[in-house]
């Protein structure tokens, strides 16, 4: 791909010449080799929220290599350049039942003060949720390969002038490109923006957060016979800049005399989805307590209050103390509850505000591939693509199961002062979709136990192991395991003695 070649050339230039010109810059690398085995389909928590790099089926050998340079930190005098740049490149190769080479990260970024511009693929999670043990933010969870995009924004909470740090914000605005391979609708674009505010200084014992994220898939062309004349004219969806304001604003627009727009699009141009988020955190003794709620939207139901029951609720307890040197030190506990069963009700009447239901999360009448990227759900992995559920279950669209009630527990701990252990335990009740409900309500348990052990070899090496289990009526019953060796370090100074932890 032309974009990939440009990114690789840029990375070569900055790594080969940047080290000579800027001694303060740190270039970090990692190498990992391992193997994954599974008795059937890869268990849920071995593949979910892994940025689309773990295959759905089969045992594999796995290799990855990455190179990254972040913005320079402040020096001993507190000086930090207002203009800076960075880059990231990560390549994953899977061999075995699935043979593939993936590039989950390839980006170049630049900073001017608080503002950042980047182009390429970058691992991201959007929304007010716990980032370590979450099931995933509703709309943008890290479950699929990152979508290539150009983005401008303020990536970290930044104080608004004259508020003395009491009011801060972060946000971004981006344009991206969906893949064409394997999709029935090709040439589609991504529009994404988000804005979050924080009330309270970092030194205060209590802080409040609020904001929203907005994603749109729009534009494209369908092959003959894929879309009916009711939703597209000759398979062509509105794709020019004329429609961009309606995409950004989510407004209906005035397209009555437009021969490209059907009556379907008089509602909205594109498929709009996202969440409105509220959160708070408090320092209580030796713990930081973080509570959050994501209110979901995939139509006008949230505006009219008809799907208010749907959402992601979370509670995180994080130990603020330095881990003890004893046999067991608890670092973090995360509880989450996800409910998506309402969707505004089982009726959709566009002229009746109280019956604008059947939101059919992650499915759409025009974008019939669903809210997926390379067949993986872009948002929460608990809204399950049809190809992941048991074949005996009725499937209604690319996302065969989007009416879910899911309970989740995540725990992070340190054993004997060195062994990093995490566990994820999830239980869900699943109803399929409104158009194609399951005849029963299959339940599902998915569990994961991981351990990372630093080794005194090669300087900065970690042994990573994972065990996972799926048992229930939604996914095929399966047991799986991963074992890998990871080496990480720095180019600009001796390798860090603390090895980076695996994403498993």
Task: Describe the function of each predicted region.
Residues 22-63, 78-89, 171-175:
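Transmembrane beta-strand segments of Gram-negative outer membrane beta-barrel proteins
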Residues 1-25, 503-504:
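Bacterial Sec-dependent N-terminal signal peptides
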Residues 33, 48-50, 83-96, 119, ...:
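Transmembrane beta-strand segments that form the barrel wall of outer-membrane beta-barrel proteins
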Residues 22-28, 69-85, 98, 111-115, ...:
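Short loop/turn motifs that connect adjacent beta-strands in outer-membrane beta-barrel proteins
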Residues 127-231:
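Internal, well-ordered domain-core segments that constitute the primary functional module
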Residues 208-212, 222-504:
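Exposed, low-structure sequence patches enriched in small/polar residues
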Residues 28, 58-66, 101-105, 147-151, ...:
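Transmembrane beta-barrel architecture of outer-membrane proteins
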